[in-house]
From Swiss-Prot:
<protein>
    <recommendedName>
        <fullName>Probable 2-(5''-triphosphoribosyl)-3'-dephosphocoenzyme-A synthase</fullName>
        <ecNumber>2.4.2.52</ecNumber>
    </recommendedName>
</protein>
<dbReference type="GO" id="GO:0051191">
    <property type="term" value="P:prosthetic group biosynthetic process"/>
</dbReference>
<comment type="similarity">
    <text>Belongs to the CitG/MdcB family.</text>
</comment>
<dbReference type="GO" id="GO:0005524">
    <property type="term" value="F:ATP binding"/>
</dbReference>
<keyword id="KW-0808">Transferase</keyword>
<dbReference type="InterPro" id="IPR002736">
    <property type="entry name" value="CitG"/>
</dbReference>
<dbReference type="Pfam" id="PF01874">
    <property type="entry name" value="CitG"/>
</dbReference>
<keyword id="KW-0067">ATP-binding</keyword>
<dbReference type="InterPro" id="IPR017551">
    <property type="entry name" value="TriPribosyl-deP-CoA_syn_CitG"/>
</dbReference>
<dbReference type="GO" id="GO:0046917">
    <property type="term" value="F:triphosphoribosyl-dephospho-CoA synthase activity"/>
</dbReference>
<keyword id="KW-0547">Nucleotide-binding</keyword>
Length: 294
């Protein structure tokens, strides 16, 4: 019974990734229609990546459940070790293309936290589908003590390094903390912004329209390391401003699709991809499934 419940929830994480890549059109991003601003990956590359990561999603939630009473840092280390194996498997499946590195990191923590939370709230194991927004908040808050050390541990000694990953370079140049920062703050972009917005949208619109509007909203607020890496601070600010204007227009679904298709070509021409917003889109979908919003 326990394993079946954990399996079903881990499959919601996979489903969230499938929904994210399938949502179309998504400016600058891989979707059903085209590869966005990416020359090295396609819709099928994402499918390959998700299949490779799927067994690890199960391992993350089972680890959180099994070690719920363990000291938080020890649980984090277990999840990170699994996450590193998952990353290697992903790169093998994609021939070295980075499809889900940051999202895998976040999913490892959130699925681990979900497992730990379920171990402490056994009624959810027998009444699956009863997740509330308070449950979501509690799960995200569990990540905060697990990752409180992370910025200092991973990014605090970069002055001794000669070569940086692009995430490290963003921190050194702009102070952008990326997925580490989001995790160490308890995923407040999710709990305070993305999910409240989506709960409102889904109560007023059909699911796909709500998802497209959520993407636009995220692109208007997220500190997007992918955009900054590709185009710099000004390009990122420009995308945010454009998306704020698009939100203010309150377009019909048909006109919104047309606007996003047009903006897709704009971002392709600039080689810009809002990958940070895409990751948070997938994470929002995961909790939307838990809360039965979708």
């Amino acid at each position: 019974m326990t394993k079946a419940v954990l399996t079903s929830i881990s499959q919601l994480a996979l489903k969230a990734l499938l929904y994210e890549v399938s949502l179309s059109p998504k400016p600058g991003l891989v979707d059903r229609f085209d590869n966005g601003a990416h020359d090295d990956m396609s819709f099928m590359t994402f499918i390959d990546s998700m299949i490779a990561l799927s067994p690890f999603f199960q391992a993350y939630i089972e680890t959180g459940f099994a070690y719920a009473k363990e000291e938080q840092l020890l649980l984090f280390n277990r999840l990170r070790q699994l996450g590193q194996k998952a990353e290697e498997t992903m790169f093998c499946a994609t021939q070295g293309i980075n499809t889900h590195k940051g999202l895998n990191f976040s999913m490892a923590l959130l699925l681990g936290a979900t497992g730990a939370y379920l171990a402490r709230t056994p009624h959810l194991m027998t009444d699956l589908g009863c997740f509330s927004k308070e449950d979501t908040l509690a799960i995200c808050r569990l990540v905060k003590p697990m990752t409180a050390h992370l910025i200092q541990a991973d990014l605090g000694h970069l002055n001794t390094k000669k070569e940086f990953t692009y995430g490290e370079q963003l921190f050194v140049t702009y102070g952008i903390k990326g997925p580490r920062g989001e995790a160490s703050e308890g995923f407040t972009t999710l709990t305070d912004h993305a999910l409240p917005y989506f709960r409102q949208m889904i109560s007023q619109n059909d699911p796909e329209t709500s998802q497209l509007r959520l993407l636009v909203y995220l692109m208007s607020i997220v500190e997007d390391g992918n955009l900054i890496h590709r185009g710099g601070i000004e390009a990122w600010k420009g995308v945010k401003a454009d998306m704020r204007l698009l939100l203010q227009q309150d377009l019909s679904t048909t006109d919104l699709r047309l606007a996003l298709s047009s903006y897709n070509q704009c971002l392709i021409n600039q080689h810009l991809s809002p990958g940070g917003a895409a990751d948070l889109l997938a994470l929002t979908f995961y909790f939307a499934f838990l809360e039965k919003l979708l």
